[in-house]
From Swiss-Prot:
GO terms for cellular component: cytoplasm. Homohexamer. The oligomerization is ATP-dependent. ATP 2 binds at residues 603-610. Residues 553-770 are annotated as: NBD2. InterPro entries: AAA+_ATPase (IPR003593), ATPase_AAA_core (IPR003959), Chaperonin_ClpB (IPR017730), Clp_ATPase_C (IPR019489), Clp_N_dom_sf (IPR036628), Clp_R_dom (IPR004176), ClpA/B (IPR001270), ClpA/B_CS1 (IPR018368). Residues 771-863 are annotated as: C-terminal. Part of a stress-induced multi-chaperone system, it is involved in the recovery of the cell from heat-induced damage, in cooperation with DnaK, DnaJ and GrpE. Acts before DnaK, in the processing of protein aggregates. Protein binding stimulates the ATPase activity; ATP hydrolysis unfolds the denatured protein aggregates, which probably helps expose new hydrophobic binding sites on the surface of ClpB-bound aggregates, contributing to the solubilization and refolding of denatured protein aggregates by DnaK. It comes from Porphyromonas gingivalis (strain ATCC BAA-308 / W83). Keywords: ATP-binding, Chaperone, Coiled coil, Cytoplasm, Nucleotide-binding, Repeat, Stress response. Residues 339-543 are annotated as: Linker. ATP 1 binds at residues 204-211. Belongs to the ClpA/ClpB family. This is Chaperone protein ClpB.
């Protein structure tokens, strides 16, 4: 016996037989050990052979285990081949020689076990196996091919192992219905009907429905809705994962693929191969001196012997196919474009029933429309209908979780009962009978209410589940009716459609009526997916608030100016302009093709330009970190403009992406602050033109980043000299006229500095006026209140007098520098001195501390 004359699977079976013998504490390797090992190693092979002979593999496996258990147990010694096993292996080699095979494979061993006198042979014969049946099963398995390689078993029934029959899945009702795409399917049918180069390749963005077209074609073939030359054809979808998985040895992957190709070509045009993600074949299996998988397919594709439908994305087609012209010309392109909103709504309506039956909830039509419209507007990096289907699916899954969970009001009652029971046990120890009786009454009332509501919840849930089960039954009946219609059993079709289905629909109406009666006093279960549910999922995915506004948010938006004035003193015009832009956005009245708003804030330093942007971020998102700040002083060189969108290919930092584009991809709903824009190189403004006009920017990798939900604020100190000069005599009375004249001069300067095409795209340019002394007083109070809150976190109570406010305002008032000197004054005279006093224990931090100003000096004392 030469082990090299055995296939890899046969060698592994022999090795497993040795291990099996050792594990059972036996010495002689008997034919039953070998049969058990062959059944484990060649699972799909023995499944096929036993099925063709009409044997039950499960019962044979059990019987073999019993035979092995009966064998004598011996301790010590190495396992050896028994006389019967040697005879079996010799018979297997003879069978291989007789069949003109180069190697002994698993089917030779099964045949040898059956024809050799041994217990394993008797077991197989008792189960109904005969040599003649096994020989015909082997012939059917091999389809006229001989064993010429050591991985021969991998090539048997290659289509069953490495592909999925889409037509069979369509017959079994396991594919989702395909709605629309008639033009693309018709074009695919035309190409498939050609004599040569009859291989369509579906090219489109991810999620537009390329695979669905192949499934739609399978449905049409099953229904007979195809030209005569394509009737009764089978579509097999190649599973690349199964093809590659377990291919340990060099050339094994190619052998598997060649076996698939041989099986398809051997069917003489009856099988169409669908290869999803076909670009993975280009380069697959390629190693030193070997050709890749695509080259194995080329000859059969060119001759028209192999009909294949490919599917890939535009990027992959460009990357792999266009480089290989020989492969490209063998496929005919079919472009699959993203469907428009109306087509996507039709697709979702067609899929609705499948998702309703899966999640056991109802999906309203307005939810479908919302899924398409909201996904199209807010989820920009993905494509319809895939993103809309995902929204509908997730909203239904979320609702199903709520249906299965205990309602919130019931959960609260249950928690309240537990809390009261704990209180009652505590009061019992104090012998307070009156309180115990009061708690008992309250617990009894709550338990009665809980039982009543729980019963209603359970009844509603049962009715909803009954309705959904009946709908699943109706779907199964429709599938049976379609199958009966294909088979020509029209009596059965009539019985199902006009008898059984009508009966189920009547049952649904009855249960629906019962459910309405139960819910008359109020429903405990929400069973319908609505537009608000879809909007909520969009908000969770993107962070963009598209759900219906609560009353509290409406009030906040209506009084946005007041909220902003709590942090930004003065600058009424700027606050009004920004608040109007935010209100337009949340009311859904903004231009959907542009950002929420774009503003240039001009003014001297320290007047609140950057602070307004920070306040806005905190107010809108409850978090200042939602402010994306780009300091334009870092973009003074010509080449630095690329940092916004990312370095071009070949340059350092290409993989990192752009500072602006990456920030907005992660936080699409945010405030973008370009600080001190006059310091940036003019080329930077060219990058921002399409952001302001179209609300989009393409990064260095070709990804389109959506700016339509951002608020863009640019600040500049341009014209600050003019503002300081004109505003020296600023008073509350002449403020309006002086501001208007100054703004005109600053705008003229701005027009000379920044290009007109950039300025023309800005919504509003606002000049911030220098702060008056009265406003400085308010800022001091604001800063002192901040210090009070900061110390309160450290358990120190702080109060201040009006004299401190007056002192800090006078010391910190400088029209040239705005509010920043105030911060420095408070730091020097208040924070520094207070920290010394607290550390030196000259004031007691456990008692309230008062800050006062006496004779021009800040003093601290305990109240």
């Amino acid at each position: 016996m030469n082990i090299n004359n055995y296939t890899i699977k046969s060698q592994e079976a022999l090795q497993q037989a040795v291990e099996l013998t050792r594990r059972h504490g036996q010495q002689a390797i008997e034919p039953q050990h070998l049969l058990k090992a062959v059944m484990d190693q060649g699972e799909s092979l023995t499944d096929f052979l036993f099925a063709k002979m009409g044997l039950n593999k499960g019962s044979i496996a059990t019987a073999v285990d019993k035979l092995i258990e009966k064998l004598p147990h011996v301790s010590g010694g190495e396992p050896y081949l028994s006389h019967e096993t040697n005879q079996v292996l010799q018979a297997a080699e003879d069978a291989a020689h007789r069949m003109k095979d180069k190697y002994v494979s698993l089917e030779h061993i099964v045949l040898a076990i059956l024809t050799t006198r041994c217990e394993a042979s008797t077991l197989l014969k008792d189960a109904g196996a005969t040599e003649q049946l096994l020989q015909s099963a082997i012939e059917e398995l091999r389809k006229g091919r001989n064993v010429t390689s050591q991985s021969a078993e991998e090539q048997y029934n290659a289509l069953e192992k490495y592909a999925v029959n889409l037509c069979q899945r369509a017959r079994d009702g396991k594919l989702d219905p395909v709605i629309g795409r008639d033009d693309e399917i018709r074009r695919v049918l035309q190409i498939l009907s050609r004599r040569t180069k009859n291989n369509p390749i579906l090219i489109g963005e991810p999620g537009v429905g390329k695979t669905a077209i192949a499934e739609g074609l399978a449905y049409r073939i099953v229904r007979g809705d195809v030209p005569e030359n394509l009737r009764n054809k089978q579509i097999f979808s190649l599973d690349m994962g199964a093809l590659i998985a377990g291919a340990k040895y060099k050339g094994e992957f190619e052998e598997r693929l060649k076996a698939v190709v041989n099986e398809v070509t051997g069917a003489e045009g009856e099988i169409i191969l669908f290869i999803d993600e076909i670009h993975t074949l280009v380069g697959a299996g390629k190693s030193e001196g070997a050709m890749d998988a695509a080259n194995i397919l080329k000859p059969a594709l060119a001759r028209g012997e192999l009909r294949a439908i490919g599917a890939t994305t535009l990027d992959e087609y460009r990357k792999y196919f266009e480089k290989d012209k020989a492969l490209e010309r063998r496929f005919q392109m079919v472009m699959v474009d993203e469907p428009d909103e109306l087509s996507s709504i039709s697709i979702l309506r067609g899929l609705k029933e499948k998702y309703e039956n899966h999640h056991k909830v109802r999906i309203k039509d307005d939810a479908i429309i919302a899924a398409v419209k909201l996904s199209h507007r807010y989820i920009t990096e993905r494509f319809l209908p895939d993103k809309a289907i995902d929204l509908m699916d997730e909203a239904a899954a979320r609702l199903r979780m709520e249906v299965d969970s205990l309602p919130e009001e019931l959960d609260e009652i249950s928690r309240r009962i537990k809390q009261l029971e704990i209180e009652r046990e505590a009061i019992k120890r104090e012998n307070d009978e009156e309180k115990v009786q009061f708690l008992d009454r309250e617990i009894a009332e709550l338990k009665e209410k809980e039982a009543s509501e729980k019963a209603q919840w359970q009844n509603e849930k049962d009715r909803i589940n009954q309705i959904q089960q009946l709908k699943i039954d109706i779907e199964e009946l429709k599938f049976q009716a379609d199958r009966a219609e294909r088979e020509g059993d029209y009596g059965r079709v009539a019985e199902i459609r006009y008898g059984l289905i009508k009966q189920k629909e009547t049952e649904i109406d009855t249960i629906q009526q019962q459910l309405h009666e139960l819910q008359r006093g109020g429903s405990m279960i929400k069973e319908e997916v609505e537009a608000d549910d879809i909007a909520d999922i969009v908000s969770r995915w993107t962070g963009i608030p598209v759900s219906r506004m609560l009353q509290s948010e409406r009030d906040k938006l209506l009084h946005l100016e007041d909220e902003l004035h709590k942090r930004v003193i003065g600058q009424d015009e700027a606050i009004r302009a920004v608040a109007d832009a935010v209100r337009r956005s949340r009311a859904g009245l903004q231009d959907p093709k542009r950002p929420i708003g774009s503003f240039i804030f001009l003014g001297t330093t320290g007047v609140g330009k950057t602070e307004l942007a920070r306040a806005l971020a905190e107010l809108l998102f409850d978090d200042e970190s939602m402010l994306t700040r780009i300091d334009m002083s870092e973009y003074q060189e010509k080449f630095s403009a690329t940092r916004l969108i990312g370095a071009p290919p070949g340059y350092v930092g290409y993989d990192e992406g752009g500072q602006l584009t990456e920030a907005i991809r992660r936080k699409p709903y945010s405030v973008v602050l370009f600080d001190e824009i006059e310091k940036a190189h003019p080329d930077v403004f060219n990058v921002l033109l399409q952001v302001l006009d179209d609300g989009r920017l393409t990064d260095n990798k070709g990804h389109v980043v959506n700016f339509k939900n951002t608020l863009i604020i640019m600040t500049s100190n341009l014209g600050s000299d003019i503002i300081r000069e004109r505003m020296q005599n600023l008073t509350a009375e002449n403020r309006r006229s002086l501001t208007a004249r100054t703004a005109d001069e600053v705008m003229q300067l701005l027009k000379h500095t920044i290009r007109p095409e950039f300025l023309n795209r800005i919504d509003e340019t606002i000049v911030f006026t220098p702060l008056t002394e009265k406003e400085i007083y308010e800022i001091v109070r604001l800063q002192l209140d901040g210090i009070v809150r900061q110390l309160a976190d450290n358990d120190v109570v702080l109060h201040y007098t009006e004299a401190v406010v007056t002192f800090a305002a006078r010391e910190g008032y400088d029209p040239q520098f705005g509010a920043r000197p105030v911060k420095r004054v408070l730091q020097r005279f208040v924070l520094n001195e207070l920290s010394k006093a607290l550390l030196a224990d000259t004031v007691d931090s456990t008692r309230p501390v008062l800050i006062d100003c006496i004779d021009g000096s800040i003093v601290f004392r305990n109240e």
